[in-house]
Amino acid sequence: MKKLIISLAILFATSLLFAQMTSIPIAKLETLHSTIVGEDYKLQISLPYPFNPENNKYPVLFYLDAFSTSGGMNEFAKMQMVTKNLEQFVMVGISYNTNPRAYVKLRVRDYIPPINKTDTIHGGDKFLSFIKTELIPYMETNYGTDPNDRGLLGFSYGGLFTTWAFKKEPELFKRLAIISPSLWYGEDEFILKNPAFLKNVKNTQNLKVFIAYGSLENPHFGESSTKLYDVLKTNNNIQVSKVIFEDEDHGSVWNAATTRALFTLYGDPFKALIKESNRFNDAKKYKQALESYELAFKKYPEQTDEWDKYDIACIYAQTGDTDNAFKYLQMLVDSKKDRYEHTLNDSDLNSLHSDSRWVTLLNAFKKGNKE
């Protein structure tokens, strides 16, 4: 009965949440012409709910490659804001009014900085000027975004651009998400060993940076990301984190990395790890699920609860690691939490039934329930 009541309560709360979510537009589509670049940019503007610009100045996150990546990230961020797992902020995806073939050429033009003064192919400098002098003022005027709290998120060439933007305009953004950056472009001297970049790293007072890449990507991505992380770590005023996503390649790392990036920059990092583990578990990627859970337990032990211990025990049971499964279930026994019925009937724990410790565990739960 207790399990039924809990399930109904969760179902009711979830139904209310989704009913609320269906009435909230995911993103507004607008077009902003840039006289600097000579391009009409399509903006995908996702607003927090409720949105009260008269009374609030909202942090804003600009993200690149919105042509192909916006939908899922906007929906995820919107739901996490409604459930208060993320702070309220505005998201602005920068895209193009074009077709996929032209999009590839345009991102090369905009995201790659000119390698020297004779480089007329790459226009990263003009694109950065568009963001600084046209897009940012537009958002501050029309949506009340906070001029002191801007973020930038980029992937691949976009990650290169995000890093380079810090080199050129160190005060423009306070939060950076750099995913699988193409920092091999121009070799280390172009950014990582550039005197202007190193000077900005040394003098920065307040910056939060998230760096990520997949373990199955070309080694260049991991090597350059690690070099970037090591340079940023030299300044204690820069909060920098680096995550390697196991079994993810250049085509798949985006979804995992953006989820963690949003939580790292705008949310509770413990909740980020737990939700990430749940996502991996649902996809039956148990190795990655356990890595996220164990990291959460290690870094934030005071935030873990009984259900977290129960969930990780179930994942270990599904992988055949009975020792760790019993270890976490025993923690529940020690905390004297009533989990007897739930443990007895959970099919995720079926692999433990033949173990001699199973009966002992159930008896311990029964004894704890009577105390």
PLM regions with names:
Residues 20-280, 286-306, 315-319, 331, ...:
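Non-catalytic cap/lid and distal C-terminal segments of serine-dependent acyl enzymes
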Residues 1-24, 371:
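Bacterial Sec-dependent N-terminal signal peptides
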Residues 300, 320-321, 351-356:
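Alpha-helix capping and inter-helical loop/turn segments
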Residues 343-371:
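Terminal, low-structured helical/coil segments at or just beyond the last alpha-helical repeat
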Residues 288, 324, 357-360:
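Alpha-helical positions within canonical tetratricopeptide repeat
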